[in-house]
Amino acid sequence: MQIGIIGTGPVGRAFGRALPALGHQVVVGTRDVAQTRSRPEWSDSGLELVPYNDLSSELFILVTGGDGALPALAAVGPALDGRVVIDATNPLDFSRGFPPSLSVCNTDSLSEQLQRAHPDARLVKMFNTVANEVMINPPAAGADSTLFVAGNDESARAAATELARELGWSDILDLGDLTAARGLEMWIPLWVRIYGQLGKPEFNLKIVR
């Protein structure tokens, strides 16, 4: 499958390593190709880098910072129409320092804002509840754990779930429509606190039935 990664931070680089190893063709969208290529983690990646507005793919994974998510999707534009867009972002607000708060919560979510801005895209919330290394290598959390998926389009959730299984996830809990993204994003302030106590980001939740 051709997969477009939207964003070039640590999460984008993690997916850029993992997905080609699974046989996927990966193209990476960035605001500035030359600047991105000059960074050591991308200079020898072997991946195609293109401006956001030239990015097209069968499936997209959005991995920008939360404040860059809406502008990034706006730049990609109509190429998103009809495509599954996995949203791995969180609406973190660092304006008052650390720990961050959420720029949106309770009655709305960043994912829902993205879906409203791009009604023809098939938004799926997934991967935002774990660190980048755990996203692509679930055993890095130290034990079997749970990944969550939410979205308004059932077939889009199924496509995202299939990709997660390719990455090694076996326990994937479907939470239904995109309003569930509110809770998934609201987990992150607690995740940040736990990270501070453990001193490492490789941990996760396990839903025991």
Each PLM stretch: what is its role?
Residues 34, 40-84, 90-97:
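Rossmann-like NAD(P)-binding element
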